[in-house]
Amino acid sequence: MFDAFTLVVSQADTRGEMLSTAQIDALSQMVAESNKYLDAVNYIT
């Protein structure tokens, strides 16, 4: 997950731009999906 954040921020920095709302939303969605996965794993174990 850290790599995805690093990639998005690095690309925006290279272009000299701030992160767009769409990029922030996509990263937030990725975190939400990861949390669902972790919740399922914790439930099983």
From Swiss-Prot:
<comment type="subunit">
    <text>Heterodimer of an alpha and a beta subunit. The hererodimer further assembles into trimers and the trimers into hexamers.</text>
</comment>
<comment type="function">
    <text>Light-harvesting photosynthetic bile pigment-protein from the phycobiliprotein complex (phycobilisome, PBS). Phycocyanin is the major phycobiliprotein in the PBS rod.</text>
</comment>
<comment type="similarity">
    <text>Belongs to the phycobiliprotein family.</text>
</comment>
<keyword id="KW-0602">Photosynthesis</keyword>
<dbReference type="GO" id="GO:0030089">
    <property type="term" value="C:phycobilisome"/>
</dbReference>
<keyword id="KW-0813">Transport</keyword>
<keyword id="KW-0472">Membrane</keyword>
<keyword id="KW-0249">Electron transport</keyword>
<keyword id="KW-0089">Bile pigment</keyword>
<keyword id="KW-0042">Antenna complex</keyword>
<dbReference type="InterPro" id="IPR009050">
    <property type="entry name" value="Globin-like_sf"/>
</dbReference>
<dbReference type="InterPro" id="IPR038719">
    <property type="entry name" value="Phycobilisome_asu/bsu_sf"/>
</dbReference>
<keyword id="KW-0605">Phycobilisome</keyword>
<keyword id="KW-0157">Chromophore</keyword>
<keyword id="KW-0793">Thylakoid</keyword>
<dbReference type="GO" id="GO:0015979">
    <property type="term" value="P:photosynthesis"/>
</dbReference>
<protein>
    <recommendedName>
        <fullName>C-phycocyanin beta subunit</fullName>
    </recommendedName>
</protein>
<dbReference type="GO" id="GO:0031676">
    <property type="term" value="C:plasma membrane-derived thylakoid membrane"/>
</dbReference>
